[in-house]
């Protein structure tokens, strides 16, 4: 028997970005909605393996929301506030998100620290996108992931102190988010730079942003191995294992 998994989509007509609501940060992309939907089960399996869970199979995606955007969704630019993002958040669920963000951070760091050729350039990735030049080395991707941590926090907080170190910055962001959560749960919708945010959306986006760029890191490592530049690489997210 198939199990329903809810998916919310964002599109500008040129591409579709779908979020799997039951799996915070899990996502699919495609030129068409059908192409994106065809990837849902595999993304769910990969995500559950990363979490150390027994994968669920025979998943049937159900589209529960479609947001039409003028952003470059085909390049994974996103603004959607999921209906789910606005719902009340129990403390147990909040803490689960926090643990997932910590786990995701450790997974990113595992890839980075075990990479021999951090500054090797994958010239085939060179292009412009909505945030500037696409990072074409693992070093640049890691720096981008790191810098965006404070960006997400700044969507709902203006009182931010600079910390040194990737994990230190992440831990600081999570402590700030917890303080906000304990004060207002998930009851407030913030509008920052014309985009709507809630605490749950910030938490979800942390994991999603890690995953989308970690996949690029592992693709570069996979290419390095194929070219004979390295013997092996780490893939803690299980993207290609």
Language-model features: locations:
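Short secondary-structure junction/hinge motifs that connect adjacent elements
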Residues: 57-64, 121-124, 187-189
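Acidic/histidine-rich alpha-helical segments that form the ligand environment
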Residues: 87-115, 161-190, 197-216
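A short mid-domain helix/strand-loop element embedded in enzyme catalytic domains
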Residues: 76-88, 101-126, 142-151
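Short, charged, surface-exposed hinge/linker loops at domain edges
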Residues: 2-4, 45-94
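The catalytic Nudix box helix
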Residues: 36
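Short, contiguous alpha-helical
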Residues: 7-15, 23-29, 39-56, 120-167, ...
């Amino acid at each position: 028997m198939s199990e329903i998994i809810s998916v919310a989509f964002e599109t500008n007509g040129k591409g579709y970005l779908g979020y799997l609501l039951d799996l915070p940060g899990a996502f699919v992309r495609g030129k068409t909605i059908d192409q994106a939907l065809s990837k849902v089960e595999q993304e769910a399996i990969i995500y559950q393996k990363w979490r150390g869970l027994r994968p669920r199979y025979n998943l049937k995606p159900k589209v529960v929301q479609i947001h039409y955007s003028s952003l470059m969704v085909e390049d994974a630019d996103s603004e959607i506030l999921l209906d789910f993002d606005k719902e009340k958040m129990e403390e147990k669920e909040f803490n689960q998100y926090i643990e997932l963000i910590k786990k995701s951070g450790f997974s990113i760091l595992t890839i980075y620290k075990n990479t021999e050729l951090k500054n090797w350039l994958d010239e085939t990735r060179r292009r412009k996108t909505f945030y500037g030049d696409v990072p074409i080395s693992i070093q640049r991707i890691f720096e981008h992931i790191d810098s965006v941590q404070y960006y997400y926090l700044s969507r709902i907080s203006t009182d931010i102190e600079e910390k040194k170190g990737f994990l230190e910055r992440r831990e600081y962001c999570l402590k700030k988010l917890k303080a906000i959560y304990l004060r207002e749960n998930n009851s407030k919708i913030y509008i920052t730079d014309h985009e709507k945010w809630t605490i749950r959306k910030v938490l979800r986006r942390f994991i999603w942003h890690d995953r989308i760029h970690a996949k690029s890191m592992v693709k570069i490592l996979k290419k390095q191995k194929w070219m004979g530049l390295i013997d092996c690489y780490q893939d803690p997210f299980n993207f290609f294992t």
